[in-house]
């Protein structure tokens, strides 16, 4: 055996073995239990970052653990390779997105291989290839045929100077990133998929996701946002028009003092003809990119329209205001305002001098709305015939009256909106729809799929090449001239079904149902919690679409979800001569000084600049505090990086990158290597004979099997990889102190090392592969079984009992494991230390906690 641990040499040899033997390639096997382990696939940005490494190490640990459980394990990888960053890079590098993307894929693929991840590379997919997006296009046409796809106008960011649509990322301080022209909101036709048709099922099935984090489930419930309420009709005074409003608080209807409508509401447009102030306000709102999320913090503003709404019960007239906090694309575009019982309405009413009336009060007292709205549920008053009713009775009575008079209906609403999948970008899958000469819009016929995205293009930074090239759109369908859709799919489309394509990546159909139903659902999915409400919801939605198309037979795409925390690193900067911050990589910090609590108080970089330390923050390009995984692998080896990633923090919490911790992980591997090297050079001919073991040998063997039990539970059930590593480290400490003088000493250490290399195999597979062979095993570690606990080894011949006198530990005694209270008490009382502390006292009570504690109370 090689005496020194040389990671680069070992890892290259082991990775070559895996590659040559196609170790991780799998096929369906009805005789084996399957396990599908999947980490969210990366965008090929150019280089892996530590966030990737953490995600993929967790996935690899789970996959390798399950493999040693004897399961048929699928762990695939691919590339989420469409998207705006490729367009921006192509513009900056004067190239096309395709070659930039494919070069990055090759580079990052090699990085993944260097880290030793056990992927089935034969299933690799890239979503930007026609072989992949062809089936996405095909499926979209099927959804259209089922009535689940439609087209309507929706607002986009529009640069009037370049006459092009901008992504949200391309709007900087309300202006175009390229020409600094103020951005407008423009309504253009776009394609939508009816996710709302599945809202109820998506919500209800959250209750079946037992293996998903509660936080993700709560976020999805809130995002779907089911509410029960009443949709009611308000008339418009002096007009033959009416409009609808939805509310979840009909009990407050008698307190409505004004109505707020979106600036884009038809009533606002009508009123603006004779109201210049309102017309200007509408134009201003049109050009603001207010998202629903920003509404909570923005200044609430409005303009009176001059119109009045007719209260559906009292007939009273209340003013209609156009307000910037009402969105036309959310609900009906109008809200009833009850400033006495809604804080936003209260503040708006105070600002503009509108009436505030209280109609709800606490059950046991009066209500004061002089300083703030009373927003709790309570008892109705000032509400005419409804006075004295509580929330539920008031809700029902008012709802029933509105329904009976034909002025309203009970309704279940969802916050969830239909999925807009159109993007006015180039680097995405073309939407497979065509417009015939007579204006009819139809799906592209199946025999004309895929609609190919041309890859040999020139990016001018203004318009999508397929929009600029008028010839590209021209086609023929059934002998008629037609024009192709020039929008491309939202890239969430590709990531919504990739997990299923891995099951049959080379099939000449979207999915091979037999293969898909063997592997699906995914047993373990791993990715960041930031994807909770977008990707993970579309992921679930698409699975139900696939099910209803007869392609899969399960209801949900993944049984278990692990959301790993972010990777943080120290961040430093200095101020340059221009007064700007220059962020310095932690690798370029030459010296640091720390206080007695270990906090950095002073830092100087390699160029002598005194640095400001801003603490730990998420690794990012903007703060230049990302650590290149490749640099760490070259310095310490992949196994060290993997071990640190698993040991430094529980998986769902943030991980603080500390090179001192990486060095500690490296030292541990060297200790393991040294112990194994010493062992293989011993005479190990004597087989383990448990019947001849001394008490010390039994105690050491007990530690081995306790560790097997703990690590098995920590990795397999609890997914607490850090405590699993800690348990093995503790066992290593016992082994290093253990004698190696007899044949049975060596036999126990041999058993322990055999267990340790398998327990650590998921985490440090290269070292484990090598040591497994050095320990004399004929087959490779991938073909071995996870170590099994010997229950007999856990049985203790004796117990160490703590003896307390009046609450203080005074002695520790060893007793037979099956000793009764009387014998333990007798032994404890006869201990010389106990006798000393009982001298002159009378024993009043003795408490025995079996196998742990003897407590003596005396005075």
UniProtKB/Swiss-Prot annotation:
Keywords in alphabetical order: Aminoacyl-tRNA synthetase, ATP-binding, Cytoplasm, Ligase, Nucleotide-binding, Protein biosynthesis
Disulfide bridge map: none
Reaction(s) catalysed (UniProt annotation): tRNA(Leu) + L-leucine + ATP = L-leucyl-tRNA(Leu) + AMP + diphosphate
GO biological process: leucyl-tRNA aminoacylation
Keyword Ligase: yes
Residues engaged in binding ATP: 621
Family: Belongs to the class-I aminoacyl-tRNA synthetase family.
Protein name: Leucine--tRNA ligase
Record organism: Shewanella baltica (strain OS155 / ATCC BAA-1091)
